[in-house]
Amino acid sequence: MKESVIRKLEGLLERNEEVLALLSDATVISDQDRFRGLSKEYSQLEDVVSSFKAFQQAQKDFDYAKEMLEEDDLEMREMAQDEYKQSKQVLEKLEDELQVLLLPTDPNDDTNAFLEIRAGAGGDEAAIFAGDLYRMYSRYCEANRWQMEVMNVNEGEHGGFKEIIVKISGDGAYGKLKFESGGHRVQRVPETESQGRVHTSACTVVVLHEVPEAEAISINAADLKVDTFRASGAGGQHVNKTDSAIRITHIPSGIIVECQDQRSQHKNRAQAMSVLAARIQAVEDEKRRSAEETTRRSLVASGDRSERIRTYNYPQGRVSDHRINLTLYRLNEVMEGDLNVLLDPIMLEHQADMLAALADD
């Protein structure tokens, strides 16, 4: 292992001991915010520190076995040979483990997420497919015991959604779903198609992380244009008689957010502001990532969120993820919410990219 990596690990070991000491300090214990922050840091350091301690012991065992190979006694050398092979395997395994643990983590992975699904090309069929995607994500959320809350919905005339925005609350929601951002294409025969021709439709999916109030970008009220209107259901039927729905336009960026799911204008405004904060933060995050990764391949399109990432082919029962050239004939399982068969390989590929970048550095 590189000397620079060893030094970094030794620094983390020292920091772990420092945090542990602080957690037993009465002054820190009385400051709940600081105590909570240090507890989180300690839990984040725990795995890498534990592995590094095991690595240090394995290194000692390996060095000792190597010395024993120089012994004059034949029996001792034979014993050392076995120990040498075994300790070398353990050392290599722990080295690989530490490299993965040292990969930079997205601080937003543990946050809640906003999921936005919009019908694209394909008219009514695209809206119906947006409904199918919503159902797929709903099943996945149920399996993970995450809560879903509809923020805004614009129903399709013949089923599905022209647009639906939901908040997903649960541990690791954003970290799991963030790779879903992009264009999703469906190939199938619509129910209204009398001649059995396969049609192609598309939807775009955007996944944003929730921005905690304490970390939210400051939004100047003077930069906002707020409109109220009556919330409406499918086909334009009014569901209440008051102007409870909210449309907020952030003038500098041109970002527009609507929220009409709650009966209270106050609640709709609060939800719209949280979505607006997430979208503005996403724009800022994108700028930062683009600056940092101008020469690095990204699994999710860096600028164009509509770039096609996946195709769902119903006649063949096939789903293909174009970012990693993965094709599975398990469409029914995926549409029932078994998304891990797609998400796990993408995460592994992303991890491999980061390891390669680490090696280059």
Curated annotation (Swiss-Prot):
It is found in: Cytoplasm. The modification N5-methylglutamine is found at Q237. Pfam families: PCRF, RF-1. GO terms for molecular function: translation release factor activity, codon specific. Peptide chain release factor 1 directs the termination of translation in response to the peptide chain termination codons UAG and UAA. Keywords: Cytoplasm, Methylation, Protein biosynthesis. It comes from Shewanella frigidimarina (strain NCIMB 400). Signal peptide: none annotated. GO terms for cellular component: cytoplasm. HAMAP family: Rel_fac_1 (MF_00093). Residues 285-296 have a biased composition (Basic and acidic residues). Residues 285-305 are annotated as: Disordered. This is Peptide chain release factor 1. The keyword Cytoplasm applies. Belongs to the prokaryotic/mitochondrial release factor family. SMART domains: PCRF. Methylated by PrmC. Methylation increases the termination efficiency of RF1. InterPro entries: PCRF (IPR005139), Pep_chain_release_fac_I (IPR000352), Pep_chain_release_fac_I_sf (IPR045853), Prokaryotic/Mito_RF (IPR050057), RF-1 (IPR004373).
